[in-house]
Amino acid sequence: MKAYTVEQGIVAPLDRANVDTDLIIPKQFLKSIKRTGFGDNLFDELRYLDEGYPGQDNSVRPKNPDFVLNQPRYQGATVLIARTNFGCGSSREHAPWALNEYGFRTVIAPSFADIFFNNCFKNGMLPVILPEDIVDQLFKECAAQEGYQLTIDLAAQEVRTPTGEAFKFEVDPFRKHCLLNGLDDIGLTLQNADAIRAYEEKTKQVRPWVFQEIN
């Protein structure tokens, strides 16, 4: 998993509350668990004017010109700002997979659905909770300035605007450690690889039948 330290990037504003996971990545695209291949269908119902289905050539589909991710000024965005209860609905982990593959490493909102919030950390993304009035301010600044960027400093737990204004955010120390060091569940386990091997060798001496192959 790629480490998250300091991220600076263009901001895309998604100005709607209660964005659920089916809107983030519709159910018809959940036929793979490879974690890849979902970015082109992120917000499919909002990005395209036709109905999406797996295997389509998205490059020839008619796009919704009014949707934020189709507007030239937001191309290359890596920071998404959203409204309350972002990521509600089903627990599909494909939602952060789609956001991540599109290019978003940070989502800023006043609140998140719990399962989506947890899944972001497991997939190298940082969900940042800021007070609603500050999120309102970010929306206004983003609308007023083309190419608006934010800097997110995980070590300092700060979101910084182009003018240098800084907003503090909270993050669980363990999750912070994992993101800073690029550790997912597998990476955390491998940190104890020597201890695991030592345990297995010891167990082979005490209970050798456990390790016998069954033909």
Swiss-Prot record:
Per the record, GO CC terms? 3-isopropylmalate dehydratase complex
Q: What class of enzyme is it?
A: lyase
Pfam families, per the entry: Aconitase_C
Tell me, which GO biological process terms does this entry list?
Answer: L-leucine biosynthetic process
Any one Gene Ontology molecular-function term assigned to this protein's record = 3-isopropylmalate dehydratase activity
SUPFAM superfamilies hit by this protein: LeuD/IlvD-like (SSF52016)
E.C. no:
4.2.1.33
Query: Which catalysed reactions does the entry list for this protein?
Result: (2R,3S)-3-isopropylmalate = (2S)-2-isopropylmalate
Read off the InterPro entries from this record.
Answer: 3-IsopropMal_deHydase_ssu, Aconitase/3IPM_dehydase_swvl, AconitaseA/IPMdHydase_ssu_swvl, IPMI_Swivel, LeuD
The biological pathway it contributes to is:
Amino-acid biosynthesis; L-leucine biosynthesis; L-leucine from 3-methyl-2-oxobutanoate: step 2/4
Q: Which UniProt keywords apply?
A: Amino-acid biosynthesis, Branched-chain amino acid biosynthesis, Leucine biosynthesis, Lyase
Superkingdom in the source lineage: Bacteria
Stated role: Catalyzes the isomerization between 2-isopropylmalate and 3-isopropylmalate, via the formation of 2-isopropylmaleate.
* Similarity annotation: Belongs to the LeuD family. LeuD type 1 subfamily.
Which PANTHER family does this entry report, sorted A to Z? Answer: 3-ISOPROPYLMALATE DEHYDRATASE SMALL SUBUNIT, 3-ISOPROPYLMALATE DEHYDRATASE SMALL SUBUNIT 2-RELATED-RELATED
Assembly with partners or alone = Heterodimer of LeuC and LeuD.
- Enumerate the HAMAP family for this protein: LeuD_type1
Give the protein name, as stated in the record. Answer: 3-isopropylmalate dehydratase small subunit
Q: Which gene encodes it?
A: leuD
